[in-house]
Amino acid sequence: MARYTGADCKRCRREKTKLFLKGSKCDTPKCPIEIRPYPPGEHGRGRTKDSEYLLQKREKQKCARIYGILEKQFRGYYDEANRRAGKTGDELLKILESRLDNVVYRGGFAPSRDAARQAVRHGHVQVNGRKVDIPSYRISENDIVEIAPKARELTPFIVARETAGQGRAVPAWLESIPSQMRILVHSLPARQVIDTQVQEQLIVELYSK
């Protein structure tokens, strides 16, 4: 599957906000957006007034980059959200949050969504006792997500277990049990508990044209 292979920090600078793509580095003064809070490139410091279309496009790109998704798959998620009964923007974020790689990240077992995606692809994650190696797999209410027993002594998961509770908070719709390397999915998230900083209405406006 195609994926972005460029510099993560340039993506944050391009969007002029932290996308939290580099794990704990994003919370330190070494984060490049703290040092150079302007877009990369020769004209990055220039001041431009974005058009309505560009604002919508940038918001879509920001959201896709946060979750590590390319355009074709992102558009597919939007089309699915648009067919649902609720607000399209809300439903889009619910779909993105229900991805397995996101749940591993949200549960604190990976420092970034990219690291979570790699853990899933390498076969280190189980859902309800069965190995799942597809990052886009959708979790459901009452699912149990856990790190496979053979993988629990790998360095990334030892670090996750030993530093549990020291970083970002686990959202209320999940329960993380670091001692068992397990995440309980109590429910699927409502929009008001999703802390992703995007204006989803701009995405809806872009795709509605």
UniProtKB/Swiss-Prot annotation:
InterPro entries: Ribosomal_uS4 (IPR022801), Ribosomal_uS4_bac-type (IPR005709), Ribosomal_uS4_N (IPR001912), S4_RNA-bd (IPR002942), S4_RNA-bd_sf (IPR036986)
Cellular component per GO, a single term: small ribosomal subunit
Record's keyword annotation contains Cell division: no
Keyword rRNA-binding applies: yes
GO molecular function, one term: structural constituent of ribosome
Pfam families (UniProt xref): Ribosomal_S4, S4
GO BP terms: ribosomal small subunit biogenesis; translation
Start and end residues of each S4 RNA-binding domain: 98-164
UniProt keyword terms in alphabetical order: Ribonucleoprotein, Ribosomal protein, RNA-binding, rRNA-binding
Function: One of the primary rRNA binding proteins, it binds directly to 16S rRNA where it nucleates assembly of the body of the 30S subunit. With S5 and S12 plays an important role in translational accuracy.
PANTHER family to which the protein is assigned, alphabetical: 30S 40S RIBOSOMAL PROTEIN, SMALL RIBOSOMAL SUBUNIT PROTEIN US4M
Subunit structure: Part of the 30S ribosomal subunit. Contacts protein S5. The interaction surface between S4 and S5 is involved in control of translational fidelity.
NCBIfam families: PRK05327.1, rpsD_bact
Family classification: Belongs to the universal ribosomal protein uS4 family.
Full protein name: Small ribosomal subunit protein uS4
Species, as recorded: Frankia alni (strain DSM 45986 / CECT 9034 / ACN14a)
Lineage: Bacteria, Bacillati, Actinomycetota, Actinomycetes, Frankiales
